[in-house]
Curated annotation (Swiss-Prot):
It catalyses: dTMP + ATP = dTDP + ADP. The gene is tmk. Belongs to the thymidylate kinase family. InterPro entries: P-loop_NTPase, Thymidylate_kin-like_dom, Thymidylate_kinase. The lineage of its organism: Bacteria, Pseudomonadati, Pseudomonadota, Betaproteobacteria, Neisseriales. Its EC number is 2.7.4.9. GO terms for molecular function: ATP binding; dTMP kinase activity. It comes from Neisseria meningitidis serogroup C / serotype 2a (strain ATCC 700532 / DSM 15464 / FAM18). It comes from the Bacteria. It holds the Pfam family Thymidylate_kin. This is Thymidylate kinase. GO terms for cellular component: cytosol.
């Protein structure tokens, strides 16, 4: 099997941070070479843009925000993702372009056609081989976000914003079931872990 590009995505409060540890443990047990990274971020340029994008004090228009996301992504692809894949290393990214369709598209209202143009220009033919989409009901997401001490620029949004974000994620997953695995992360930790491990086992033929 060629090196796999796997993404982990979902609305805020879906438990990505917790379940990244599950994925790391899965790769470690099998001794598979893997690189973990994140978006926006993953490079010095990307991390600098992340600081701007998540800062609650940032006043950026929709197009500027979207372009910053893709600028960080282009650097990420060129400097991190493609080199790792070329070296035979699997890549797991905490968020990727699905998040742009969901947050800037669904949440903010950026036309999906414009995002698709940028996606093609920045990524070429690069697409994830597998996307683990962590999903929780809106009220669970909002409750978990409410427990965050310092909310970033996106976490400060209201429930209707996250309702639109979640809807886009689920619609994209339904339209491409061969790539997406929707994980109910409202279940207990053991059940979520088992679900993720089952998907990875199936994808890698373990």
């Amino acid at each position: 099997m060629k090196p796999q590009f796997i993404t982990l995505d979902g609305i805020d409060g879906a438990g990505k941070s917790t379940n990244l540890a599950v994925i790391k443990a899965w790769f470690e047990r099998r001794g598979l070479p893997v690189l973990f990274t994140r978006e926006p971020g993953g490079t010095p340029v990307g991390e600098a843009l992340r600081e701007i994008l998540l800062n609650p004090e940032t006043k950026a228009g929709l197009r500027a925000e979207t372009l910053m996301m893709f600028a960080a992504r282009m650097q990420h692809i060129e400097d991190v993702i493609l080199p790792a894949l070329s070296d035979g290393i699997h890549v797991v990214s905490d968020r990727f372009t699905d998040a742009t369709f969901a947050y800037q598209g669904g949440g903010r209202g950026m036309p999906s056609e414009d995002i698709e143009i940028l996606e093609h220009w920045v990524q070429g033919g690069l697409r994830p081989d597998l996307t683990l989409l962590l999903d929780v009901p809106l009220e669970v997401s909002m409750a978990r976000i409410g427990q965050t001490r310092e909310k970033d620029r996106f976490e400060q949004e209201q429930a209707d914003f996250f309702m639109r974000v979640r809807s886009v994620y689920l619609n994209r997953a339904a339209a491409c079931p061969e790539r997406y695995a929707v994980i109910d992360s409202n279940l207990g930790l053991d059940e979520v872990r088992n679900s993720i491990e089952k998907v990875l086992d199936g994808h890698f033929g373990c």
